[in-house]
């Protein structure tokens, strides 16, 4: 009898040791483990929250389980107290973690419109982030906006003179060109003078070449002009030859006189 009691005590001690190593059992026997942080939006309601408190009354809960179930997070209370239709607020912006069920507009529409709206406000005010109010969002939902507004943005051309009043103060291209040319001329007067001198020299060369070509053509065309030029050339050649012959004669006479004087001495 003593040996049987000892073996039973030994077995009970082994079972108690194994149970101490095992994790605590879940309070819900009819399904997998459940946490209040992962409550889906479709199940949220007063009945679902009441079911969280129900369970096995005889089961002893640990301190961590009671803390998770009794102290619910603040966002869960807000979702439970929130009406079915969300109340729109002018300065409220939902974060990316909020569920899709509480947003009326599709995500793609909102993203595309924010891109288009940001570009519009960049041109006007210089701010890329723009928070839309309830009136503006309602008006935009009523208007048919395309899913890809980038094609329409590419067609828009921003012209600076469109923002000017209708008093006739529009820029003139000719006046702008004249002003720029006058500024450059006043700033570089020395270079303009040099270029004018170069142009005048080139013009004079062109005039000389044209006159020479005209005279040559006239001489070739007129036979009388040819004969006159030939006679003038012959006269000049004869005069030059006579002058040379006179010079030679004078030099020869001078040499002869020198030789006579040398012989007399």
Swiss-Prot record:
Organism of provenance: Arabidopsis thaliana (Mouse-ear cress)
Coiled coil location: none
GO molecular function: DNA-binding transcription factor activity
Residue ranges, compositional bias (Polar residues): 1-11, 170-179
Protein name, as recorded: Uncharacterized protein At4g06598
One term under GO cellular component: nucleus
Biased composition (Low complexity): 180-191
Region annotation Disordered: where it falls in the sequence: 1-33, 158-197, 219-244
InterPro entries according to UniProt: At4g06598-like (IPR044797), bZIP_RF2 (IPR044759)
